């Protein structure tokens, strides 16, 4: 009988232990108060954008929203102009974009993103990005039912395209975790030097052979880390939370590998007094917030999010988590770990609708903890508001 098999028994016990751990862990709740900053406390200003969904056409629509959503990339250009003005008045330390930079990972979309970014060099020097499911897992913009075969080079092409784009943005400032030494290694730029010819050949030919040889490259690139400038400074740990999917209907699934979680431990040991932003695309657990439809609750949180929450517990008073994915504006905490979910400054309605994003200020609060001060909301007026003015 199958239920008498030792593997079946072991699986049942493991599932029971997992459920007990999930039930016993702290539950997410809204952030009831913000930290206060002493005069001697250090502060870091972080602009948090997410899900900007850049399209490759001037009047292009998005996969998710179609004709009921925004067109083109004017809203992103407006956000960058606002950031440039904010930075000139009160300097920022970081502009963090937590995934879904593009709408479908196409080369034209990446080109449009860089076309906007290059107009604001001061902001470009502050930007750190990470991949979202739309950058990697959208098989076909026009046909959600289309499959990517596991051996298809198209998925690898989207991965390589993303890595190349991230290197252009932050190649000199982030370092790659070395699994052999269990310490931070070379910069992203240096790590890719020996693969440049191979990447260029794959981009030209798209062969399965080159796709296989580049398979490990994507895996070993995460986490990327911008280390703190001082022993007790602020560092940024960039995770890849995207599951390896081959079907558009499952493209939103997320998971953080155990290798990345172990790397976080080693990085924290290397910088024991540092503060951290842990940045990823997907939200860790379901939050205590109402949704309009059931589909928003299905398959969008991390598959192993509760496990990762428990794992990050060791960083709770020295870290905050920042993410995007569902375009939800939420600030809360779970077991002492502050979590910030970013709204999308682009999505959420047509170009007539107003959108917004936040500039957060992190501080060295009482007791040496990392605190979150009240955020600065930056409004982006829609065309309707602009006409009214």
Placement of each model-derived feature along the sequence:
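N-terminal active-site segment of His-dependent metallophosphoesterases
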Residues: 2-112
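Beta-strand-turn-beta hairpins that frame and shape the catalytic cleft
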Residues: 36-47, 220-238, 274-275, 333-339, ...
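Active-site neighborhood of phospho(di)ester-bond hydrolases with catalytic His/Asp-centered motifs
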Residues: 48-50, 93-100, 126-133, 239, ...
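Active-site environment of divalent metal-dependent phosphoester hydrolases
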Residues: 53-58, 103-105, 133-141, 244-247, ...
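Extended active-site neighborhood of metal-dependent phosphoesterases/phosphodiesterases
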Residues: 112-262, 311
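Active-site-proximal segments of metal-dependent phosphoesterases and phosphodiesterases across multiple
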Residues: 243-262, 269-319
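Conserved beta-sheet core of the metallophosphoesterase superfamily
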Residues: 288, 293-367
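A short C-terminal boundary segment appended to hydrolase-like catalytic domains
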Residues: 362-389
